[in-house]
UniProtKB/Swiss-Prot annotation:
Its main location: cytoplasm. It holds the Pfam family Ribosomal_L21e. Component of the large ribosomal subunit. The ribosome is a large ribonucleoprotein complex responsible for the synthesis of proteins in the cell. The keyword Ribonucleoprotein applies. The keyword Transcription does not apply. The gene is rpl21. GO terms for molecular function: structural constituent of ribosome. This is Large ribosomal subunit protein eL21. Keywords: Cytoplasm, Endoplasmic reticulum, Ribonucleoprotein, Ribosomal protein. GO terms for cellular component: cytosol; endoplasmic reticulum; ribonucleoprotein complex; ribosome. Component of the large ribosomal subunit. Belongs to the eukaryotic ribosomal protein eL21 family. The lineage of its organism: Eukaryota, Metazoa, Chordata, Craniata, Vertebrata. SUPFAM superfamilies: Translation proteins SH3-like domain (SSF50104).
Length: 33
């Protein structure tokens, strides 16, 4: 998961992705794109 490469993801979003996993992973991808 190349989330670190983007670098545009806020820590709060990253932490949510790390905690919830796939569910918030979708929201994270939506934020990046």
């Amino acid at each position: 998961r190349p989330f670190r490469k983007h670098g545009a993801v806020p820590l709060s979003t990253y932490m949510r992705i790390y905690k919830k996993g796939d569910i918030v992973d979708i929201k994270g991808m939506g934020t990046i794109q």
